[in-house]
């Protein structure tokens, strides 16, 4: 299988005088077609590792490689370009724009990449249909249930056909039934499109549905 994301000897420390390291010599590979889960207690560094993997945060030391390109250490321009071109994101709190319709929210990543309005609308509409949200396209975010909002967030995260999807506690604010449904949508999309996926979650039951479970504790990463 093709390696999409590779993290090599990555550490992340904060502070100078009272230095605290939340990640220590992390090594991780995510392959195309693989959906992996990252588990750990609150404060274990899951979000920090995901931010580094998504090129939003720079490691103190180590290397991050995305699709064969070294993205850390690298310039801000390189990280931004690679992130926009190859990555899709889903967060616990959806960050959807309240003043936009569902369709306009999902179109936004396409527009950021420079696609015209008609192309962006066509692609976004197709993704919403895949999510079973075609009837909600013209709705405002405030009109949706929590589960529907999170499915819109998933749609927005995958609309640009990213090489890898990174999700940080995407079901943390949902009830168990809706959590399972949203998690299933992510999993199925990764498999159907032969993408790579890494999801941070505190839900071990959901984590067991993935191809591989990784545990972060004391700044160290182990595979379960």
From Swiss-Prot:
The gene is lolD. GO terms for molecular function: ATP binding; ATP hydrolysis activity; transmembrane transporter activity. It is a peripheral membrane protein. Belongs to the ABC transporter superfamily. Lipoprotein translocase (TC 3.A.1.125) family. SMART domains: AAA (SM00382). One of its GO terms (cellular component) is plasma membrane. It is found in: Cell inner membrane. Its EC number is 7.6.2.-. InterPro entries: AAA+_ATPase, ABC_transporter-like_ATP-bd, ABC_transporter-like_CS, ABC_transpr_LolD-like, MacB-like_ATP-bd, P-loop_NTPase. GO terms for biological process: lipoprotein localization to outer membrane; protein localization to outer membrane. Part of the ABC transporter complex LolCDE involved in the translocation of mature outer membrane-directed lipoproteins, from the inner membrane to the periplasmic chaperone, LolA. Responsible for the formation of the LolA-lipoprotein complex in an ATP-dependent manner. Residues 5-224 form the ABC transporter domain. Keywords: ATP-binding, Cell inner membrane, Cell membrane, Membrane, Nucleotide-binding, Translocase, Transport. This is Lipoprotein-releasing system ATP-binding protein LolD. It comes from the Bacteria. ATP binds at residues 40-47. The complex is composed of two ATP-binding proteins (LolD) and two transmembrane proteins (LolC and LolE).
């Amino acid at each position: 299988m093709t390696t999409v994301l590779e993290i090599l000897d990555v550490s992340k420390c904060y502070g100078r005088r009272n230095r605290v390291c939340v990640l220590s010599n992390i090594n991780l590979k995510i392959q195309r077609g693989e959906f992996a889960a990252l588990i750990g207690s609150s404060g274990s560094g899951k979000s920090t590792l995901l931010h580094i993997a998504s090129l939003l945060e720079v490691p103190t030391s180590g290397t991050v490689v995305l699709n064969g390109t070294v993205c850390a250490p690298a310039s801000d321009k390189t990280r931004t370009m690679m992130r926009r071109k190859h990555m899709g994101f889903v967060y616990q709190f959806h960050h959807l724009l309240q003043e936009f319709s569902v369709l306009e929210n999902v179109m936004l990543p396409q527009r950021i990449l420079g696609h015209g309005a008609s192309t962006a609308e066509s692609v976004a509409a197709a993704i919403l249909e895949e999510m079973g949200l075609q009837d909600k396209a013209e709705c405002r975010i405030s009109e949706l249930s929590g589960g529907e909002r999170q499915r819109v967030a998933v749609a927005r995260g995958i609309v640009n056909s990213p090489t890898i999807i990174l999700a940080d506690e995407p079901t943390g604010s949902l009830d168990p039934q809706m959590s399972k449904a949203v998690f299933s949508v992510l999993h199925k999309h990764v498999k159907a499109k032969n993408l790579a996926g890494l999801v941070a979650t505190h839900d071990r039951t959901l984590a067991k549905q993935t191809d591989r479970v990784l545990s972060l504790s004391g700044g160290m990463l182990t595979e379960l």
